[in-house]
């Protein structure tokens, strides 16, 4: 199983790249974890946000290919670490790749939401999209460590 994090936005601050890569490199070889960045549409005071969301959404879904789509969205389902570990095992047992989608400043397109088999909420708070990359990477690594009895996670 491969996990792909597909996120709108490029040129992240160095702390985001460093934080994400720290957890990415810890993943086992049999569960690769990759990041695909989708360039954000140009936004301005006269920007057609609906069109921008549609373009970003199409690019995200195209990057996902045949993987199971899971959106990261405030109205999604919150998972505890043990629940995320169970979810990780279920995805692994399904034998399919998983694509986690992080939208841009206005969120995800309706097409992305419609394509999603699941929606995961990290928090009822609105989080900065760059920070979400690091939180997701750490959360997935922690969940993996729980499934393998690795000492990283402690109750």
From Swiss-Prot:
- Which reaction(s) are listed as its catalytic activity? pseudouridine(1915) in 23S rRNA + S-adenosyl-L-methionine = N(3)-methylpseudouridine(1915) in 23S rRNA + S-adenosyl-L-homocysteine + H(+)
Query: Where, if anywhere, are coiled coils annotated?
Result: none
Where's it mainly located?
cytoplasm
Q: Which residues bind S-adenosyl-L-methionine?
A: 72, 103, 122-127
**Matching InterPro entries, A to Z?**
Alpha/beta_knot_MTases, RlmH-like, tRNA_m1G_MTases_N
Q: Which Gene3D superfamilies match?
A: 3.40.1280.10
- Which keywords annotate this record? Cytoplasm, Methyltransferase, rRNA processing, S-adenosyl-L-methionine, Transferase
What subcellular compartments does it reside in?
Cytoplasm
Molecular function (GO) terms listed?
A: rRNA (pseudouridine-N3-)-methyltransferase activity
Which EC number(s) does the record attach to this protein? 2.1.1.177
Note the SUPFAM superfamilies from the entry: alpha/beta knot
Pfam families membership: SPOUT_MTase
Q: Does the keyword Electron transport apply?
A: no
Listed under GO cellular component are: cytoplasm
Name the domain of life.
Bacteria
Tagged with keyword Cytoplasm: yes
Subunit details: Homodimer.
The entry assigns this protein to a family as follows: Belongs to the RNA methyltransferase RlmH family.
Mind telling me which NCBIfam families this protein's record contains?
PRK00103.1-1, PRK00103.1-4, tRNA_RlmH_YbeA
Q: What does this protein do?
A: Specifically methylates the pseudouridine at position 1915 (m3Psi1915) in 23S rRNA.
- Designated name of the protein: Ribosomal RNA large subunit methyltransferase H
**UniProt organism field:** Haemophilus influenzae (strain 86-028NP)
The top of its lineage is: Bacteria, Pseudomonadati, Pseudomonadota, Gammaproteobacteria, Pasteurellales
**Encoding gene (name):** rlmH
């Amino acid at each position: 199983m491969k996990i792909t994090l597909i996120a709108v936005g490029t040129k992240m601050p160095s702390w985001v790249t460093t934080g994400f890569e720290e957890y990415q490199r810890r993943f086992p070889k049999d569960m690769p974890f990759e990041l695909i960045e989708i360039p954000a549409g140009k936004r301005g005071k006269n920007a057609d946000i609906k069109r921008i969301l549609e373009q970003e959404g199409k690019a995200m879904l195209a990057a996902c290919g045949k993987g199971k789509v899971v959106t990261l969205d405030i109205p999604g389902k919150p998972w505890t670490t043990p629940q995320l570990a169970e979810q990780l095992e279920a995805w692994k047992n399904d034998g399919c790749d998983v694509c986690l989608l992080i939208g841009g400043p206005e969120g995800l397109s309706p097409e992305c939401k419609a394509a999603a088999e699941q929606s995961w909420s990290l928090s009822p708070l609105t989080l900065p999209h760059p920070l979400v990359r690091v939180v997701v990477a750490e959360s997935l690594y922690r969940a993996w460590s729980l499934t393998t009895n690795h000492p990283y996670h402690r109750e």
